[in-house]
Amino acid sequence: MRARTLIATLLLQMVTACGGSAAEAPPPIPAPAGANAGIPFVANILVDQFGYRPNDPKVAVIRNPQTGYDSAQKFAPGSPYQVRRASDGTVVLSGALTPWNQGAVEASSGDNGWWFDFSSVVTPGAYFVYDKANNSRSAVFQIDQEVYKKILKAAMRMYFYQRSGFAKQRPYADTCWVDDPAYIGPNQDGQAHDVTDRDNTGKIRNLAGGWFDAGDTNKYVTFAVTPVHQLLTAYQATPRVFTDDFNIPESGNGIPDLIDEVKWETDWLKRMQYRDGSAALKVGEIVDALADPPSSDKNPRFYVPSCSSATIAVAGMFAHASFVFGSFPALSGEAADLRARASAAWKNYQSIDSKQTQCDTGAVRAGRADWNEQDQNAEAVVAAIYLFAITDNPEYADFVSAHHKELQPYRDVGWSRYKVEQGEALLFYAGLPHVDPKLRTSILADKLADVRAGNHVYGFVPDDDLYRAYIHDAQYHWGSNNPRANYGNSNLDVLALKLDPADSKRYETRALELLHYFHGVNPLGMVYLSNMYPYGASRSANEIYHTWFSHGTRWSDARSSACGPAPGYVPAGPNVFAVRDGVPSSLSPPAGQPAQKSYLDWNTGWPQSSWAITEPGIYYQSSYVELLSKFAQ
């Protein structure tokens, strides 16, 4: 019942921010002033709640629910619609609405609606969309060339808050989320025991550092693959947006803060590696325990020892990091060390005739971190790509030539919507100077063939989705926000590679609209980032499933708790298979809803299993960060 009350409140009332402070965020977007101050905000007039760059398309979506939990909340818009300046209410544009798809109900949301195009408004400032007949308005938004830069900083700071064994102290952490270093006590990460030989003190290892994987505080080598590669790829694509001022302890050291953050993770991965080049699989606990805050958890920590999946995973991550770190003179020694470690891991992996696929028994909670042999071999191609980039050794080029069609782009449409590091590595390889020209041509032709095949993955198609951000219904699974962001990243690859210059605007628009979906242009009218009120959101995710920000604590709810969760965490997203994943069928929403409404803003644990909907992950985060970074310049 509590969950139903929360979602009703979310849809009917304007949310008041509870968390955050001036130290954590920039000044919020100005609210309507003067005679406009009393105009109510409604979740039926949807815009990107942060805003738009001046020359980008700008289209508000006006929603009218037809099916689902909110079907009784009908909305009949007036005409004309206006864009008003927030500071004084001046009307800067007045125009008509366009019915979406001739008034049809969009099946995946259960809504019909209208579009209001205000792309002609380009002057920087704060605005809102106004329905005069209903005396209702959208969220206030900014038009500014750098409107997404502060959002990028907030999203990247999630990794700082996820650091294990590191103090979260002011001025780098807001007062609400100050915490002592976690897992530095006796028999914890600095003295982790082998879970397969728990009493053998000779196998105690220092495995401190790294990032908490998700809403739990465990650390997985194989789960780090996507975020490490994707963050490095994001930096390579748009280095100028990743500046040295993201308010982490390393800020101002002359190295971009994204690189500092990735190095925090690779430093831990180095501790996971054995002298023979192999790597341990994961670190965590053998009991389920809350950690609110993480420093309060004093349980002993254990590791799963050497496994071929972890070994080939670190080979790729070390090689990629070596390539990127090598461009910084201050990190030349680190780059050389990572190169040697990547080579050692590669050799160890290649020496194993029968790859290990059952290393993780589940004794260390919670997620199973094994890879099957097919996935290990695919990640070996990724490792070979980056090893070739840093060595020019033909051994690695030969391996890529022989095995590149084992990568995800050849198993699925959409190239990089899943296992994004594989598709992105292949495109990176095609751009290296000493690659076989025939293979380069073949890879780019295969990418273009994927684009030409369509499958509703590439390019903006107006009739596909009322909310302008189509993904297939099959992608509304646990973690749907991950492929959603990667649909955008795959479209932007087409632009970067200039594969279809005549149609370039369609790919950019598709990616932009997917970003706007994250920022509130969706059936919930909610920003899919936690507690973003200090950054100007009118309605953002208030609760996420995370052991630190757990149900009933001072960090539980951005509306009603003392603090709420830290800003900028990307939750898993709508999940039409929620009941299969443990959510009770009686809890509706998220159960029994159209795909886009298969979401509930809550964080209750067992037996409601909110982790299948609202748990964040370092891999969801990296997909969103990469997408956002392309527009933060």
Residues covered by each model-derived region:
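Solenoid-like repeat scaffolds
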Residues: 405-413
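Low-complexity, Pro/Ser/Thr- and charge-rich linker/hinge segments at domain boundaries
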Residues: 33-39, 137-176
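Acidic, glycine-anchored loop motifs typical of Ca2+
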Residues: 250, 254, 258
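Bacterial N-terminal signal peptides
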Residues: 7-17
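Aromatic (Trp/Tyr) and acidic
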Residues: 45-135, 160-225, 229, 267, ...
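Bacterial Sec-dependent N-terminal signal peptides
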Residues: 17-38
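Bacterial N-terminal signal peptides that target proteins for export
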Residues: 1-7
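An active-site-proximal structural segment forming one wall of the substrate-binding cleft
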Residues: 258-276, 303-356, 396, 400-403
